[in-house]
């Protein structure tokens, strides 16, 4: 699958629709897309998706659906009805769940990209050990990614540290969306496995997710432009 349009996804990690729209108005939909996650969507609902779409932005609805197959299928279909560009599910929900999500989109002429989440970038080996998983983050990512591809997903969310291996294992057309991306001048925050935008793209990331380095910048538009220029 070829990558078209902006590769930068700005994480709109707000709890108020007005704060989201104030920032969106400073950004250029020709340079970036917007990621709307659980906190903002729970607070503002579909209205926030519609509002930023009216400003010209593609939306990645980052709700990481993980439930029984029928419930996830209904949620993915609802997201598609909103006209989102991308939506995601947890690969750990299993093959039947992911296949149900894919099948829910069959009748849509303009389907959103359907992406599976592998291992959250906040998790390292000690976190996995704590929930009874002894394999490395890299091994778990590879296993879940193979299951996601088998289930008909368009790609995965993974650390940029695994993006290159993902392309080798799953093929160049299998999309990689990588959070935990921070310019070298910023702190890592709560993301443990982080790389810079340039490193991420060089390592095989198709789309990079950046939050606070843009949303909390003194000049968000300039911060966004700097990242875009660094990956072109």
From Swiss-Prot:
Reaction(s) catalysed by this chain's protein: orotidine 5'-phosphate + H(+) = UMP + CO2
GO BP terms, alphabetized: 'de novo' pyrimidine nucleobase biosynthetic process; 'de novo' UMP biosynthetic process
Active site (catalytic residues): 64
Keyword Lyase: yes
Keyword terms of this UniProt record: Decarboxylase, Lyase, Pyrimidine biosynthesis
Function: Catalyzes the decarboxylation of orotidine 5'-monophosphate (OMP) to uridine 5'-monophosphate (UMP).
The name this protein goes by in its record: Orotidine 5'-phosphate decarboxylase
Gene source species: Teredinibacter turnerae (strain ATCC 39867 / T7901)
Underlying gene: pyrF
